[in-house]
Regions:
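Conserved alpha/beta-domain cores
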Residues: 1-212, 218-220, 232
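Gly/Pro- and small hydrophobic-enriched strand-loop and loop-to-helix capping segments
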Residues: 222-240
Length: 241
C-alpha cells in the first residue's frame, strides 16, 4: 500500500516535470501540448503505476516484456497507451505486438520481420519507431545513423507495420553540450526521414530525453520524453512488478 507521502511526492514530481517541459517548449516556440510525457515504469509495481495513471502522464513505457504483460493484464495504465521502450528479443515479439501501442526499439531487419509476421498473424497494424545508436556505443542497441536508411525503407514497405519515427538514448557519459548535439542530430535525421515521403508511414515522433536531460531534448525537437526516476524516485531493483 502506497503512503500518502509517496502519492504526494509523485504528484509534485509530475507537476514539476510538466512545468519544465512547458518552459523548454516555449523557449523554442513550440506548443507544450505537442510533447508527450512517458512514465518509464521499469521495476515499478502495478500499484505504483495505477496510482500514477491519474496524474497528467500521457503514456507508460516498459523495458521488460514480462512487466508489459503483467501491467497490461492488470489494466495498470488505466486506458492510457503503453509503449515498449527496451531491447526486444525476437523470441518475445509475439507477447509485445498488439499489447504495446508503439514499439520504440526496432533496430534490425530481423526484428522488423518478426514484428511484421506477428502483426500479420494477429491481423493488426503495429506502430513502431526505429532506435538509433546515436553515440555509436558497442554496449547499446540501435542501428547506426549510416545504416538507418535501408531499415527505414524496409519498414515502410511492410503491410502490417506503420512507421512513426525515431528513438534514441545518448551516451550516459556525454557532457550536456554533447548530449544536446546528439539530440540535434536526431532532429535532423527525423527531418531527412520525413522528406522521403513514405506512403505507409507518418514520421512525426521523436522519442528522446530522460530524467536528466529532457529539457534539452525538447529544445531540440523531442515529441516524447521518457522519464522514470524523476517521477517515481530511485529504483529498487529487488522489487518485482
Amino acid at each position: 500500500m502506497l503512503t500518502q507521502e509517496q502519492l504526494t511526492m509523485m504528484a509534485e514530481n509530475v507537476a514539476r516535470i510538466r512545468e519544465k517541459m512547458a518552459a523548454a517548449a516555449r523557449e523554442t516556440g513550440r506548443d507544450p501540448a505537442d510533447i508527450l510525457l512517458c512514465a518509464a515504469c521499469k521495476t515499478r509495481t502495478v500499484e505504483e503505476v495505477i496510482a500514477s495513471a491519474v496524474l497528467p502522464i500521457d503514456l507508460f513505457g516498459e523495458n521488460h516484456v514480462q512487466e508489459l504483460v503483467e501491467k497490461t493484464d492488470a489494466n495498470a495504465y488505466c486506458g492510457k497507451p503503453g509503449h515498449f521502450i527496451g531491447h526486444l528479443q525476437t523470441n518475445k515479439v509475439n507477447k509485445v505486438v498488439g499489447r504495446a501501442a508503439l514499439i520504440e526499439s526496432v533496430d534490425s531487419e530481423h526484428l522488423l520481420q518478426k514484428v511484421e509476421r506477428a502483426a500479420a498473424a494477429a491481423n493488426l497494424t503495429q506502430e513502431i519507431l526505429i532506435e538509433i545508436n546515436i553515440g555509436g556505443e558497442e554496449s547499446k542497441s540501435g542501428v547506426s545513423a549510416e545504416s538507418l536508411w535501408p531499415l527505414l525503407d524496409m519498414a515502410a514497405a511492410q503491410p502490417h507495420i506503420r512507421l512513426r519515427g525515431l528513438m534514441a538514448i545518448p551516451p550516459a557519459a556525454a557532457t550536456p553540450d554533447e548530449t544536446r548535439a546528439f539530440f540535434a542530430q536526431m532532429r535532423e535525421l527525423l527531418a531527412k526521414a520525413a522528406d522521403r515521403h513514405y506512403e505507409n508511414a507518418k514520421m512525426d515522433i521523436l522519442s528522446m530525453g530522460m530524467s536528466g536531460d529532457y529539457p534539452d531534448a525538447i529544445r531540440e525537437g523531442a515529441t516524447i520524453v521518457r522519464i522514470g526516476t524523476a517521477i517515481y524516485g530511485a529504483r529498487d531493483y529487488s522489487k518485482k512488478a
